[in-house]
Amino acid sequence: MVAQPFFGYINERFGIVKMTTLSLSVIIGGVFGFLWAPNLFWLTVFYGIVLVCLNGTAPMMEVFATQSPYAFGKIRVWGTIGYSVGVQIAGWVYHQFSPQAVYYTVLITIVLSIFCLSAVRMKTREKKEEKVKEPVSIRPLLHNGPYLFFIVLIGLASGVGNIGHTYIPELLMDSGLPVHIASTVVAISVVVEAPLIFFSDRFMDHWPLRVLIALPIGIIFAQYAIYALPSPVFLKVIMTLLAKHTTGMVLIMVSLRFIAQQVNGKDLVLAMAIVQGARYLGTILLQPLAALCIERGGYQVMSFFLAGVVGIVFLLSFALKMPQGKAHGLFGGKVD
């Protein structure tokens, strides 16, 4: 979380491709560290290094996808597909070979990623950057009231959503679903976001920004309200499929559009990195409270609490001042 602004700053200074390549190279070193680590202490150290680089790279890839001459969804959807396939491959390698074999598989995929990244050419973007040499600074962002308010809203909403990744499988099992069915529901919920991403240019560039902000937050509220109330288990399954991953992805896309319209272009990556840090902070702050609710009253009390938090965020979103700038087809691509 602390490293996010730093990653954003150095990406703006030296370029997304160079810094992402460097981050992936550091991850390779971290994976070799996993293979070498003689005890839990060193495993923790290398895990921290790898996690910092992965989390620091993630928001840059979202921005990178919007800078492509192709539609955002046509690029970003491969992230969802890759995640789903990667989980299956890792599980297969783990069972067929050994736990350490997973590390070697990761090394191969990262080397392939670096090779593919080196082949990417962004000529139009590079020409624009040659003309603009303004220094990157966090100061304008700290004086940007709507941006700071937006960070608070996204941090809390994403925090509630991220807590779901931890507790929803157990919540579904607590509602009566067998373990294998609950796991299947969670796995399918990852794939459900793929069509939403693929066709994101159909609505992200055209719908009013206020609607795009309120819609995923409202869906998260409905999701946890259904969890909190004595609802049929099939309704909880449906809401899990519709909301668990899709709302998080929409919030990321909304963040990209809001920042593109509200923030100076030279600070775009830095601003997105700070938003990503706020999302982690929201999770960190809400996680112990959610755990306390579970200890005191079970998953139903936790769901009431999270529904209350996101309900407040939903109401506050209508007080957010919308940016006056234009997104200029941020998600539609510009293929010549």
Task: Name every feature range the model reports, one short phrase each.
Residues 54-69, 250-263:
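Intracellular juxtamembrane helix-capping segments at the cytosolic ends
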Residues 211-255:
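C-terminal transmembrane helical hairpin of 12-TM major facilitator-type secondary transporters
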Residues 3-15, 94, 196-208, 294:
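Helix-to-loop junctions at the C-terminal end of transmembrane segments
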Residues 30, 41-57, 155, 235-250:
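Hydrophobic core of transmembrane alpha-helices in multi-pass small-molecule transporters
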Residues 267-296:
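A late C-terminal transmembrane helix in Major Facilitator Superfamily
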Residues 69-79, 179, 263-275:
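Loop-to-transmembrane helix entry/capping segments in MFS-fold secondary transporters
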